UniProtKB/Swiss-Prot annotation:
Keyword NADP attached: no
UniProt xrefs under Pfam families: Ribosomal_L31e
Key words of the record: Ribonucleoprotein, Ribosomal protein
Protein name: Large ribosomal subunit protein eL31
HAMAP family: Ribosomal_eL31 (MF_00410)
Single biological process term from Gene Ontology: cytoplasmic translation
Single GO term (MF): structural constituent of ribosome
Amino acid sequence: MAGLKDVVTREYTINLHKRLHGVTFKKRAPRAVKEIKKFAKLHMGTEDVRLDPRLNTEIWKRGVKGVPFRMRLRISRRRNEEDNAKNPLFSYVEPVVVASAKGLHTVVVEEEEA
C-alpha cells in the first residue's frame, strides 16, 4: 500500500446547497462541516478527516445560517506520521479561493514536495 498512489491531492466543488436543503437554520453551518467530512471520507477513502481552520472560517463567515451554496475544496490524502496511528492515511481539507465555484471540474493537483 505504501506507494505513490496512496498520496494524492484533488480539487473538488461541493454543492452544499443540496446537502443542507431542509436543515434548520441554526444547524446549517455545523451540518455543513459534517457533510464536508462525509464527502472527503467518501472520495478519499480515509476514516480520519481533518479540516483546515481557514475552511471553518469560510463556512462560518456569514453566520450559522448563511453557508455558501457551493465551495471549492482541495482534499489531500496524506500519510499519517504519528507513532501507533490507528489509520495509515488521513485526508486534509482546505478551501480554494475562486471567483465562482460554478462549472468547475475535479482536478488532480500536482504538489511540490520540499
